[in-house]
Amino acid sequence: MAVEKTNSSSSLAEVIDRILDKGIVIDAWARVSLVGIELLAIEARVVIASVETYLKYAEAVGLTQSAAVPA
């Protein structure tokens, strides 16, 4: 996949359209410790994509119901 470079600026609508078309995953992990004792751990994975994009990639990795049921 090649990175496209343009000299013109993109509008917010173009950016949102590209994110929904391609999808984006934000994976975050944080830990709060005091004197070596873990007080709080947070893990988060946020997926932003259109329903069509999600279903296309979820089916490819076997996350949909139709992919889970053997034929």
Curated annotation (Swiss-Prot):
InterPro entries, A to Z: Gas-vesicle_GvpA-like, Gas_vesicle_GvpA, GvpA, GvpA-like_CS
Protein location: Gas vesicle shell
Keyword Protease: no
GO CC term, one of those recorded: gas vesicle shell
GO MF annotations, alphabetized: structural molecule activity
UniProt keyword annotations, A-Z: Gas vesicle
Main subcellular location of this protein, as a coarse class: other
Reported function: Gas vesicles are hollow, gas filled proteinaceous nanostructures found in some microorganisms. During planktonic growth they allow positioning of the organism at a favorable depth for light or nutrient acquisition. GvpA forms the protein shell.
Alphabetized HAMAP family for the sequence: Gas_vesicle_A
Membership in a protein family: Belongs to the gas vesicle GvpA family.
Subunit composition and interactions: The gas vesicle shell is 2 nm thick and consists of a single layer of this protein. It forms helical ribs nearly perpendicular to the long axis of the vesicle.
Listed PANTHER family: GAS VESICLE PROTEIN A1, GAS VESICLE STRUCTURAL PROTEIN 2-RELATED
UniProt protein name: Gas vesicle protein A
Species name: Microcystis aeruginosa (strain NIES-843 / IAM M-2473)
Gene responsible for this protein: gvpAI
